[in-house]
């Protein structure tokens, strides 16, 4: 069917049914509805493709709205005719409180970077040496500056969308991604013999849309968003899909990473992108070039760099991929990146502006950071109004004054940085930046350790630090207390309920329910999450305490070596240095932390509250390895969080939603109808609480 068919059919339906967006569509009989509903879906899909992918609409917005409204009215009248790939299902009214974690079928790895022609020639040389081939064909395409996503299609249907996460596991944001009209809800992969397919992509916001959003925010006296990438990433993680649909998001796909059956994987990257393009996805196909040698690659990268400012979207470089997919296994991967692809990074953008003032912020461990307030300047489509000056030494080295004209640069398209001062433009009333001697938050005297560059506030009760410490203690890698983010931490601190991390474990339901933002359910959820966090173990507690230089890896080594927090408290610096990767600075920092009486008091209060301060193994056994559990309803034996910990200690994983990866749905009292219905539809085994407990007992 060609364009003329779709255009003529649209006009025919508009005329036959007298459709208009400001009129109620006619109510059809079910027989009439069945006859026309698939035609309407095909028409809307076609017009979405013309508008969002090709940017070449062939009907007016009013005509589009009219046929969309007609389809919606039919589905409202006959809900049994709704299908998962219907275009009306892009927006769900459900508001999620959390995003379940999902494992990517293929890891979402980073790319190694190249910055000049010599780097690109070295990449070409390595590819030829590893492959044993004299001639290599490359695909070169823009490197979009957005939020990474993976899309999963099964039997032609879009069944799951996820964020990049840590590369192995991301967050399930399917409902939000369904609102993006450049993501087809159905694509005819079965025509290519493909049953299951995972695609990589990027969610972006065009420069003009980003500029308009920020202009509207500033008109309402709201702070502008920092850059399109952060706004796109934040948008796909909004809790309400109805809010996501209001954002001007575009999704582009640029890589097929997994296919079943595997022998139906396209033979070339160029062929894979063309297939996606032909199936209605927005891809880099029209901007992609097939290059016969590395000189053609270099020439195309330079050409695209020269036109980057005229592009409607932000790019920070080009991606070069070996075209022959059969070479990918042979070329292999490093620990973090494929050897068959590389990114060519463009030179950073620069602009000049004036330093209006300098303020001093207090970090979680007390570091004082000078932040320059700038005369707003546009740099690569982003308005820059502030920039970190890092520390006192940086200010002295650059000889930065208030009212100086400075050259700033956006490295990697995101982080603004002061490159130099234009000293010839320094006005007579320019003032040197005076570093404070006392904390701007609590007034305590600042200290600087020998050999270090940072001035620090060492008052553990400093208000600016306390809120950040609470947030860090509750973070995912620490105690993982769901619902205790920065806003709630600030609320609890302002209400004088939590002045110290140990206070978290003495909160009561009655304390929370009287606060703004807390209803009975959210208050109980937080109390349950706090209770569940008590069993996280020593490594997570150590990391959560926020000891300077003690990250999660070091915390795990300390826990593994000492087993109990009181052994660490008693350890000497010399003892601590016996542990791998712990040197003088880290050992001294640990001793200083445990040498403060208020920190010892905090640990005692954590212990009295029942927080486990001994080492726990991540999994007691692997009897349930490979299984995934989902819980619905109320369990009488324990909270859901505790139940999750029980199965995870036996090697299983958990999720908040039922998918084809689910092994068991554990059903408690008053279960959710949606999870039960989906489990039944997918053939997932459901078990009662009693069966669940027997399964745990048998697995110990």
UniProtKB/Swiss-Prot annotation:
UniProt cross-references to CDD domains, sorted A to Z:
BRCT_DNA_ligase_like (cd17748), LIGANc (cd00114)
Family to which the UniProt record says this protein belongs: Belongs to the NAD-dependent DNA ligase family. LigA subfamily.
Q: What catalytic activity is recorded? A: NAD(+) + (deoxyribonucleotide)n-3'-hydroxyl + 5'-phospho-(deoxyribonucleotide)m = (deoxyribonucleotide)n+m + AMP + beta-nicotinamide D-nucleotide
Protein name per UniProt? DNA ligase
Please tell me which top-level EC class this enzyme sits in: ligase
Q: Name one Pfam family in it.
A: Nlig-Ia
Q: Which residues bind Zn(2+)?
A: 439, 442, 457, 462
- GO BP terms, alphabetized: DNA repair; DNA replication
Kindly list the positions annotated as binding NAD(+). 61-65, 110-111, 141, 164, 202, 321, 345
State its cofactor. Mg(2+); Mn(2+)
The residue ranges crossing the membrane are none
- Keywords (A to Z) from UniProt: DNA damage, DNA repair, DNA replication, Ligase, Magnesium, Manganese, Metal-binding, NAD, Zinc
EC number of this enzyme: 6.5.1.2
Q: Which GO terms describe its cellular component?
A: cytosol
GO terms assigned for molecular function: DNA binding; DNA ligase (NAD+) activity; metal ion binding
Q: Which organism is it from?
A: Hydrogenobaculum sp. (strain Y04AAS1)
Q: What does this protein do?
A: DNA ligase that catalyzes the formation of phosphodiester linkages between 5'-phosphoryl and 3'-hydroxyl groups in double-stranded DNA using NAD as a coenzyme and as the energy source for the reaction. It is essential for DNA replication and repair of damaged DNA.
Q: Cite the active-site annotation.
A: 143
The residue ranges of the BRCT domain are 619-700
């Amino acid at each position: 069917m060609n364009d003329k068919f779709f255009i003529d059919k649209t006009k025919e339906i508009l005329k036959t049914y007298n459709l208009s967006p400001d009129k109620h569509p006619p109510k059809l009989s079910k027989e009439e509805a069945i006859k026309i509903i698939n035609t309407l879906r095909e028409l809307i899909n076609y017009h979405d493709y013309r508008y969002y992918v090709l940017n070449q609409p062939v009907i007016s917005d009013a005509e589009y709205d009219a046929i969309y409204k007609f389809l919606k009215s039919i589905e409202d009248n006959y809900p049994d005719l709704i299908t998962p790939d219907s275009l009306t299902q892009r927006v769900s009214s459900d508001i999620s409180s959390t995003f379940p974690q999902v494992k990517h079928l293929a890891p979402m790895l980073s790319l190694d970077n190249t910055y000049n022609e010599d780097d690109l020639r070295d990449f070409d040389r390595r590819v030829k040496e590893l492959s044993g081939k004299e001639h290599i064909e490359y695909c070169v395409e823009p490197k979009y500056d957005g939020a990474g996503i993976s899309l999963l299609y099964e039997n032609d249907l879009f069944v799951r969308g996820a964020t990049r996460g840590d590369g192995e596991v991301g967050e399930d944001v399917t409902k939000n991604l369904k609102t993006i009209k450049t993501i087809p809800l159905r694509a005819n992969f079965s025509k290519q013999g493909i049953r299951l397919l995972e695609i990589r992509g990027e969610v972006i916001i065009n420069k003009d849309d980003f500029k308009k959003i920020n202009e509207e925010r500033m008109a309402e006296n709201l702070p502008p968003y920092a850059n399109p990438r952060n706004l796109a990433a934040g948008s796909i993680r909004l809790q309400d899909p109805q809010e996501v649909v209001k954002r001007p998001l575009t999704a582009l796909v640029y890589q097929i990473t997994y296919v079943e059956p595997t022998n139906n994987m396209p033979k070339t990257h160029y062929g894979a992108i063309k297939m996606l393009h032909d199936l209605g996805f927005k891809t880099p196909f029209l901007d992609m070039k097939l290059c016969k040698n590395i000189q053609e690659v270099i020439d195309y990268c330079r050409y695209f760099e020269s036109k980057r400012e005229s592009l409607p979207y932000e790019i920070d470089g080009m991606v070069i991929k070996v075209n022959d997919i059969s070479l990918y296994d042979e070329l292999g991967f490093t620990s973090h990146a494929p050897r068959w692809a590389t990114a060519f990074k463009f030179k950073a953008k620069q602009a000049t502006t004036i330093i209006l003032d300098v303020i001093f912020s207090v970090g979680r461990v007390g570091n004082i950071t000078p932040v320059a307030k700038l005369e707003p300047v546009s740099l690569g489509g982003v308005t820059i109004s502030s920039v970190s000056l890092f520390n006192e030494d940086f200010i002295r080295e650059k000889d930065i004054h208030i009212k100086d004209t400075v050259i700033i640069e956006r490295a990697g398209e995101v982080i603004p940085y002061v490159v130099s001062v234009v000293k010839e433009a320094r006005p007579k009333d320019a003032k040197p930046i005076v570093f404070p001697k006392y904390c701007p938050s609590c007034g305590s005297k600042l200290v600087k350790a020998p050999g270090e560059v940072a001035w620090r506030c060492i008052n553990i009760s400093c208000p600016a630090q306390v809120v950040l410490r609470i947030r860090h203690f509750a973070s995912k890698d620490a105690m993982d207390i769901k619902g205790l983010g920065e806003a709630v931490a600030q609320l609890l601190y302002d209400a004088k309920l939590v002045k110290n991390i140990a206070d978290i474990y003495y909160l009561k339901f009655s304390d929370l329910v009287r606060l703004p933002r807390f209803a009975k359910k959210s208050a109980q959820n937080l109390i349950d999450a706090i209770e569940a966090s008590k069993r996280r173990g020593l490594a997570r507690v150590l990391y959560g305490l926020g000891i300077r230089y003690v990250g999660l890896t070091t915390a795990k080594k300390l826990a593994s070596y000492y087993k109990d927090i009181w052994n660490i408290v008693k350890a000497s610096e010399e003892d601590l240095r016996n542990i791998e990767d712990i040197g003088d600075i880290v050992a001294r920092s640990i001793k200083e932390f445990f040498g403060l009486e208020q920190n010892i008091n905090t640990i005692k209060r954590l212990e009295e509250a029942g927080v486990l301060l001994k080492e726990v193994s991540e999994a007691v056994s692997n009897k349930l390895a490979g299984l995934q559990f989902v819980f619905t309803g109320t369990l009488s034996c324990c909270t859901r969080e505790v139940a999750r910990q029980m199965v995870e200690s036996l090697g299983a994983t958990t999720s908040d939603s039922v998918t084809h990866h689910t092994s068991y749905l554990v059903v408690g009292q008053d279960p959710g109808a949606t999870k039960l219905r989906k489990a039944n539809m997918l053939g997932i085994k459901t078990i009662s609480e009693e069966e669940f407990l027997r399964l745990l007992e048998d697995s110990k």
